[in-house]
Protein backbone atom coordinates (compact mmCIF):
# COMPACT_ATOMS: atom_id res chain seq x y z
CA UNK A 1 0.00 0.00 0.00
CA UNK A 2 1.06 3.59 -0.52
CA UNK A 3 2.18 5.76 2.35
CA UNK A 4 -0.60 7.33 4.42
CA UNK A 5 1.38 8.82 7.31
CA UNK A 6 2.69 12.38 7.24
CA UNK A 7 6.37 13.27 7.00
CA UNK A 8 7.17 15.89 9.63
CA UNK A 9 8.11 19.25 8.18
CA UNK A 10 8.00 22.84 9.49
CA UNK A 11 4.94 24.87 8.59
CA UNK A 12 5.25 28.48 7.47
CA UNK A 13 2.47 31.02 7.78
CA UNK A 14 1.96 32.37 4.24
CA UNK A 15 1.54 35.84 5.72
CA UNK A 16 5.16 35.75 6.89
CA UNK A 17 6.63 34.61 3.57
CA UNK A 18 8.23 37.17 1.28
CA UNK A 19 6.30 36.95 -2.00
CA UNK A 20 8.97 38.75 -4.01
CA UNK A 21 11.72 36.13 -3.96
CA UNK A 22 12.17 32.48 -3.00
CA UNK A 23 14.19 31.65 0.08
CA UNK A 24 17.82 32.51 -0.70
CA UNK A 25 19.09 29.09 0.35
CA UNK A 26 16.67 27.32 -1.97
CA UNK A 27 17.58 29.66 -4.81
CA UNK A 28 21.27 28.91 -4.29
CA UNK A 29 20.62 25.17 -4.42
CA UNK A 30 18.60 25.42 -7.64
CA UNK A 31 20.97 27.78 -9.42
CA UNK A 32 24.15 25.97 -8.37
CA UNK A 33 23.00 22.49 -9.36
CA UNK A 34 24.92 21.13 -12.31
CA UNK A 35 25.00 17.83 -14.19
CA UNK A 36 28.33 16.47 -12.96
CA UNK A 37 29.87 13.44 -14.63
CA UNK A 38 33.19 13.16 -12.79
CA UNK A 39 33.33 12.31 -9.11
CA UNK A 40 35.87 11.84 -6.35
CA UNK A 41 36.32 8.17 -5.39
CA UNK A 42 35.00 8.72 -1.85
CA UNK A 43 31.66 6.99 -1.29
CA UNK A 44 28.91 9.16 0.27
CA UNK A 45 27.62 7.68 3.55
CA UNK A 46 24.61 5.44 3.08
CA UNK A 47 22.78 7.55 5.67
CA UNK A 48 23.16 10.55 3.37
CA UNK A 49 21.86 8.59 0.38
CA UNK A 50 18.87 7.51 2.45
CA UNK A 51 18.13 11.15 3.30
CA UNK A 52 18.11 11.96 -0.41
CA UNK A 53 15.62 9.15 -0.94
CA UNK A 54 13.47 10.46 1.91
CA UNK A 55 13.31 13.76 0.05
CA UNK A 56 12.22 11.85 -3.06
CA UNK A 57 9.26 10.49 -1.12
CA UNK A 58 7.92 14.01 -0.56
CA UNK A 59 7.40 14.60 -4.29
CA UNK A 60 3.84 14.92 -5.60
CA UNK A 61 2.46 11.93 -7.46
CA UNK A 62 -0.57 11.07 -9.55
CA UNK A 63 -3.48 10.04 -7.31
CA UNK A 64 -0.88 9.98 -4.48
CA UNK A 65 -0.08 6.41 -5.58
CA UNK A 66 3.68 7.07 -5.31
CA UNK A 67 4.61 4.77 -8.22
CA UNK A 68 8.35 5.35 -7.82
CA UNK A 69 10.77 2.59 -6.92
CA UNK A 70 14.50 3.05 -6.33
CA UNK A 71 17.48 0.72 -6.69
CA UNK A 72 20.71 1.84 -5.00
CA UNK A 73 23.90 0.42 -6.53
CA UNK A 74 27.22 1.02 -4.78
CA UNK A 75 29.50 -1.96 -5.48
CA UNK A 76 31.84 -1.77 -8.45
CA UNK A 77 30.92 -5.32 -9.44
CA UNK A 78 27.23 -4.48 -9.87
CA UNK A 79 27.96 -1.19 -11.61
CA UNK A 80 30.36 -2.89 -14.03
CA UNK A 81 27.86 -5.66 -14.75
CA UNK A 82 25.18 -3.13 -15.61
CA UNK A 83 27.55 -0.94 -17.63
CA UNK A 84 28.80 -3.92 -19.64
CA UNK A 85 25.28 -5.12 -20.48
CA UNK A 86 24.11 -1.64 -21.47
CA UNK A 87 27.30 -1.02 -23.44
CA UNK A 88 26.86 -4.22 -25.43
CA UNK A 89 23.30 -3.19 -26.27
CA UNK A 90 24.46 0.28 -27.28
CA UNK A 91 27.11 -1.21 -29.54
CA UNK A 92 24.59 -3.51 -31.25
CA UNK A 93 22.11 -0.68 -31.80
CA UNK A 94 24.70 1.76 -33.10
CA UNK A 95 26.18 -0.89 -35.39
CA UNK A 96 22.72 -1.56 -36.83
CA UNK A 97 22.47 2.19 -37.47
CA UNK A 98 25.68 1.98 -39.53
CA UNK A 99 27.44 4.48 -37.30
CA UNK A 100 31.20 4.87 -37.41
CA UNK A 101 32.86 1.98 -35.50
CA UNK A 102 35.36 4.33 -33.86
CA UNK A 103 32.56 6.59 -32.60
CA UNK A 104 30.69 3.55 -31.29
CA UNK A 105 33.73 2.27 -29.43
CA UNK A 106 34.36 5.67 -27.86
CA UNK A 107 30.73 6.11 -26.81
CA UNK A 108 30.61 2.65 -25.23
CA UNK A 109 33.82 3.32 -23.32
CA UNK A 110 32.54 6.72 -22.18
CA UNK A 111 29.28 5.19 -20.96
CA UNK A 112 31.13 2.45 -19.05
CA UNK A 113 33.40 5.02 -17.38
CA UNK A 114 30.47 7.23 -16.35
CA UNK A 115 28.52 4.40 -14.80
CA UNK A 116 31.41 2.70 -13.01
CA UNK A 117 33.07 5.99 -12.04
CA UNK A 118 30.09 7.19 -10.02
CA UNK A 119 30.32 6.19 -6.34
CA UNK A 120 26.55 5.66 -6.09
CA UNK A 121 23.93 4.91 -8.71
CA UNK A 122 20.22 5.37 -8.05
CA UNK A 123 18.08 3.61 -10.63
CA UNK A 124 14.65 5.24 -10.94
CA UNK A 125 11.85 2.81 -11.72
CA UNK A 126 8.10 3.07 -12.14
CA UNK A 127 5.48 0.52 -11.15
CA UNK A 128 1.90 0.47 -12.38
CA UNK A 129 0.77 -1.93 -9.64
CA UNK A 130 -1.31 0.67 -7.80
CA UNK A 131 -2.14 2.99 -10.69
CA UNK A 132 -5.59 3.05 -12.29
CA UNK A 133 -6.30 0.65 -15.14
CA UNK A 134 -8.48 1.20 -18.21
CA UNK A 135 -9.88 -0.94 -20.99
CA UNK A 136 -8.80 1.39 -23.76
CA UNK A 137 -5.21 1.91 -24.87
CA UNK A 138 -5.45 5.69 -24.98
CA UNK A 139 -6.25 6.21 -21.30
CA UNK A 140 -3.84 3.44 -20.33
CA UNK A 141 -1.06 5.27 -22.12
CA UNK A 142 -1.93 8.51 -20.35
CA UNK A 143 -2.00 6.76 -16.99
CA UNK A 144 1.52 5.45 -17.62
CA UNK A 145 2.61 9.01 -18.42
CA UNK A 146 1.17 10.17 -15.10
CA UNK A 147 3.26 7.57 -13.31
CA UNK A 148 6.47 8.44 -15.14
CA UNK A 149 5.92 12.14 -14.42
CA UNK A 150 5.69 11.26 -10.74
CA UNK A 151 8.99 9.38 -10.88
CA UNK A 152 10.65 12.32 -12.64
CA UNK A 153 9.54 14.72 -9.91
CA UNK A 154 10.96 12.38 -7.27
CA UNK A 155 14.22 12.29 -9.21
CA UNK A 156 14.42 16.08 -9.27
CA UNK A 157 13.97 16.11 -5.50
CA UNK A 158 16.94 13.74 -5.18
CA UNK A 159 19.15 15.96 -7.34
CA UNK A 160 18.27 19.11 -5.41
CA UNK A 161 18.72 17.34 -2.07
CA UNK A 162 22.11 16.08 -3.27
CA UNK A 163 23.16 19.62 -4.15
CA UNK A 164 22.04 20.86 -0.73
CA UNK A 165 24.07 18.07 0.91
CA UNK A 166 27.34 18.92 -0.81
CA UNK A 167 26.96 16.19 -3.41
CA UNK A 168 26.45 16.35 -7.16
CA UNK A 169 24.41 14.25 -9.55
CA UNK A 170 23.60 13.62 -13.18
CA UNK A 171 20.48 12.17 -14.76
CA UNK A 172 21.16 9.39 -17.27
CA UNK A 173 18.33 8.43 -19.65
CA UNK A 174 20.10 5.35 -21.03
CA UNK A 175 17.98 2.78 -19.12
CA UNK A 176 14.94 3.99 -21.10
CA UNK A 177 16.48 2.47 -24.24
CA UNK A 178 16.87 -0.98 -22.68
CA UNK A 179 14.49 -1.37 -19.71
CA UNK A 180 14.07 -5.14 -20.07
CA UNK A 181 17.83 -5.62 -20.23
CA UNK A 182 18.31 -3.56 -17.06
CA UNK A 183 15.54 -5.50 -15.31
CA UNK A 184 17.15 -8.81 -16.20
CA UNK A 185 20.73 -7.76 -15.46
CA UNK A 186 19.87 -6.46 -12.00
CA UNK A 187 17.18 -9.07 -11.29
CA UNK A 188 14.68 -6.36 -10.39
CA UNK A 189 11.35 -7.14 -8.72
CA UNK A 190 8.54 -7.88 -11.15
CA UNK A 191 6.87 -4.76 -12.49
CA UNK A 192 9.74 -2.38 -11.73
CA UNK A 193 10.29 -0.58 -15.06
CA UNK A 194 13.54 1.44 -15.32
CA UNK A 195 13.00 5.08 -16.30
CA UNK A 196 16.36 6.71 -15.63
CA UNK A 197 19.44 6.56 -13.47
CA UNK A 198 21.16 9.12 -11.26
CA UNK A 199 24.90 9.16 -10.68
CA UNK A 200 25.66 10.61 -7.25
CA UNK A 201 28.89 11.52 -5.49
CA UNK A 202 31.28 14.24 -4.40
CA UNK A 203 32.11 16.32 -7.49
CA UNK A 204 35.59 16.21 -9.01
CA UNK A 205 34.80 19.41 -10.92
CA UNK A 206 32.18 22.14 -10.92
CA UNK A 207 30.39 20.93 -14.03
CA UNK A 208 29.61 23.06 -17.04
CA UNK A 209 27.63 26.31 -16.66
CA UNK A 210 24.13 25.73 -17.93
CA UNK A 211 22.62 27.72 -20.77
CA UNK A 212 18.89 28.31 -20.62
CA UNK A 213 16.46 29.98 -22.98
CA UNK A 214 15.15 33.38 -21.81
CA UNK A 215 11.78 33.50 -20.09
CA UNK A 216 10.10 35.39 -22.92
CA UNK A 217 10.97 32.58 -25.32
CA UNK A 218 9.22 29.84 -23.35
CA UNK A 219 6.34 31.57 -21.53
CA UNK A 220 3.06 33.02 -22.80
CA UNK A 221 0.98 35.19 -20.44
CA UNK A 222 -2.67 34.81 -21.38
CA UNK A 223 -4.12 37.16 -18.78
CA UNK A 224 -1.56 39.89 -18.23
CA UNK A 225 1.94 41.01 -19.11
CA UNK A 226 4.79 40.23 -16.71
CA UNK A 227 5.39 42.90 -14.09
CA UNK A 228 9.14 43.06 -14.64
CA UNK A 229 11.87 41.36 -16.62
CA UNK A 230 13.26 38.54 -14.45
CA UNK A 231 16.86 38.57 -13.34
CA UNK A 232 19.21 36.54 -15.53
CA UNK A 233 20.43 33.23 -14.10
CA UNK A 234 23.71 33.28 -16.01
Predicted features along the sequence, with ranges:
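Glycine-rich, charged/polar anion/phosphate-binding loops
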Residues: 55-57, 105-110, 182-185, 205
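Short coil/turn connectors at secondary-structure junctions
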Residues: 117-120, 167, 190-194
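Small-aliphatic-rich amphipathic alpha-helix that forms the alpha element of a beta-alpha
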Residues: 56-57, 122, 128, 139-184
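Glycine-rich phosphate/pyrophosphate-binding beta-alpha loops
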Residues: 57-64
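A glycine-rich helix N-cap at a beta->alpha junction
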Residues: 91-99, 185-210
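C-terminal helix-cap and adjacent tail motif
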Residues: 1-22, 194-234
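Glycine/small-residue-rich phosphate/adenosyl-binding loop
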Residues: 2-3, 66-150
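Short acidic N-proximal helix/loop "leader" segments that mark the beginning
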Residues: 1-54
